[in-house]
A protein has these predicted regions:
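A short loop-to-beta-strand scaffold at the N-terminal edge of the catalytic core in hydrolase folds
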Residues: 2-11
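Conserved HGGG/HGGXW glycine-rich cap/lid loop of the alpha/beta-hydrolase fold
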Residues: 11-54
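The conserved beta1-alpha1 loop
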Residues: 19-23, 88, 207-208
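Residue-level signal for the nucleotide or nucleotide-sugar donor/cofactor binding architecture
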Residues: 26, 61, 65, 244
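Flexible "cap/lid" subdomain of the alpha/beta-hydrolase fold that forms the substrate-access gate
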Residues: 45, 52-86, 93-229, 237
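C-terminal alpha-helix
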Residues: 73-77, 252-259
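Catalytic histidine-centered segment of alpha/beta-hydrolase-like enzymes
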Residues: 237-246, 250
Length: 259
């Protein structure tokens, strides 16, 4: 099944649909362990973000274009029923923005390691050192996208190694950096109209504590945990919890969805 030239991988059976959205520098394969655990009771829908496939031409998608693709994916895979979003990294960013604009389409949200990243509270907790780390790696990847070619690919892979990214380096390239170029270089029209995420439905937020910087603020996590039906879980991992602790993450997701 295709939506806007985006190939959807659909597995599993069940009355509810889980839409899985990855981030940098991953593909739909990031969610393999989660699909294995969830497909017995849920219909799992996943795809590689537009522009992240190495076979696709290097380009920046507009913010509105990406949200429209998400809307079509949700409506065409779960007609008339709300979905559960399972999100990581840039998938969190785009999924959160989508959920705030289309609350009628989203029943629950599982967010992995990205919360209110970039908010005033998050920036205050990061401090100068943390903000510098974020600025350096994000600008590096934005420039890698802009440069492209072998040099840009090399820059992207070097950053992935530096960040101890578990993704197969053969799949990583400069083309995946366009969300950073959207943020810092205005590519695709930039990120106009972005709102700080405040969940309007039950949410499970999971984050790894072993990272140079946090992508959420403590107060935001406290507010999420205080919402009815929501939960916050800390893992002794880095950014890629689903790779480092797949069994524990799967158990947390299944338990929360069943509650």
């Amino acid at each position: 099944m295709k939506v806007n030239d985006v190939e959807l991988i659909i597995e599993g059976a069940g009355p509810k649909v889980i839409v899985m959205i990855h981030g940098w520098p991953d593909t739909y394969r990031l969610w393999d362990p989660q699909v294995d655990a969830l497909k017995a009771g849920y219909r799992c829908v996943r795809f590689t973000l537009p522009g992240f496939d190495r076979s696709a031409p290097r380009r920046a998608y507009s913010f509105a274009e990406l949200l429209e693709i998400l809307r079509r994916v949700v409506e065409e895979t779960s007609p008339g029923k709300r979905v559960i979003l399972l999100l990581h990294d840039w998938g969190c960013f785009f999924g959160y923005q989508f959920a705030m604009r289309h609350p009628e389409l989203v029943e629950r949200i599982v967010g992995v390691d990205i919360g209110d990243a970039g908010s005033r509270e998050n920036r205050a907790e990061l401090g100068f050192r943390g903000m510098t780390i974020v600025l350096v790696y994000q600008l590096w990847l934005a420039l890698a996208w802009k440069i492209g070619g072998r040099l840009g690919d090399g820059m992207a892979r070097w950053m992935a190694r530096t960040m101890r990214c578990p993704t197969d380096p053969r799949t990583i390239g400069a083309h995946m950096g366009y969300p950073y170029a959207m943020r810092w270089l205005g590519a695709g029209g930039g990120l106009q109209g972005v709102k700080v995420f405040a969940p309007q439905c039950p949410m499970l937020f999971m984050y790894g504590k072993r990272k140079p910087v946090m992508f959420h603020s403590r107060r935001w996590a406290e507010r999420v945990a205080a919402q009815p039906g929501s939960r916050v879980i800390e893992f002794d991992t880095g950014h890629w919890i689903m790779v480092q602790r797949p069994r524990e993450l799967n158990e947390a997701v299944l338990g929360w969805l069943a509650s």
